[in-house]
Amino acid sequence: MRILFVTWAWPSHLYAMVPVAWACRAAGHDVLVASQPELTGTILGTGLPAAPVGGDVDAAAVFREIALPPPATERRPAPGGPRVLGLLTTLAEAMTDDLVELGRNWRADLIVFEPTAFAGPLAAAALGVPAVRHLYGTDLLSAAGRFLPDALGPLCEKLGIAAVDPFGAATLDPCPPGLQVPVGSRRLPVRYVPYNGPGLLPAPPPATPPGRPLVCVTWGTTLSRLDPGLFLAGQAARAIGGLDVDVLLAVTPAQRGLLGPLPAGTRVAESAPLHLLAPGCDLVVAHGGAGTLLTALAHGLPQVLVPRLPDHVRHSARLGEAGAGVVLPAEEAAPEAIRDAVAGVLASPGHRDAAERLRREMHGQPAPAGVVPELELIAAGGTPS
């Protein structure tokens, strides 16, 4: 079987699909990952073969407009949701023609796409092959389903297809049920296996007094890419430096210079995937990105989240509703608020209990290898169980 995985050029959306892609490869199937040229090097870094399609689009510019308040002299732009949907249709338009040609020439049997890569189901419909959606977090687009036919209508017309199901024949869902919202198509649960990119195992930490909590602070990669002022990892570390905790900062080399002065004893881990750092931690302070959130939950860690982008806000809200942490709106995340939230979560066993409950749910879902037979069934024209 030939399985074509599709994402637009955003690394975290790719990373969510890597474990299932490798499970398919290990089962003997041919796997290819298609995305815009900008992501080619990142795909190759996963060990999977890449196929560039379409042209690059400056998605960061749209997210930057959403995340940063407009100058007082400018009119406030449209809400973030419509602008994001407009961006996603632009990305689909940039990729779809090349993706259809690639799928035809490569003779794809199945397309697996991340939920915001509409080029995936569009190409599948044009090629007459099934498509399966692969979530990277909570199902953010299920609530937007009624808007998608109109948004994708012009692309369907261009491809000569009557309509497209943007949710696919089924949805691979790595979220534990206690975190997820209702899914827009048949749900195929799959265990979340953290893949946070390649990296080095950090040196063992120095010995600390028994019972002293270790707090990991990370701000992902998106916000520093949009604007250095949105990267709050250094501020968060300084905010909690006065507590009786050890602080571990997880950053990229490019982010190291954005941290500023740090409290004495703060450890900084560069280029270390979060899943290698999480096992020794007691709490994660972060920005609310899905990859960070799910990786922390995979280790049963409660979280303090300061989300800013719309998807981060919605992922974080679900974590807060599940009781596995505290969410601080970005505009209210003063240093003392972060410090108090961290102290409160560490002192409350209820947050850790909720995180542990979600961890058990997550580990109770089938491993990536366990969903490969379902994908084989869908590719053969069957209905998943």
Language-model features, listed with the residues they occupy:
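Short glycine/proline- and acidic residue-enriched helix-loop micro-motifs
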Residues: E74-L87, W219
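A short, active-site helix/loop in glycosyltransferases that binds the activated sugar's phosphate group
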Residues: E157-P189
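Donor-nucleotide binding loops and adjacent catalytic segments primarily
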Residues: R191-L283, V313
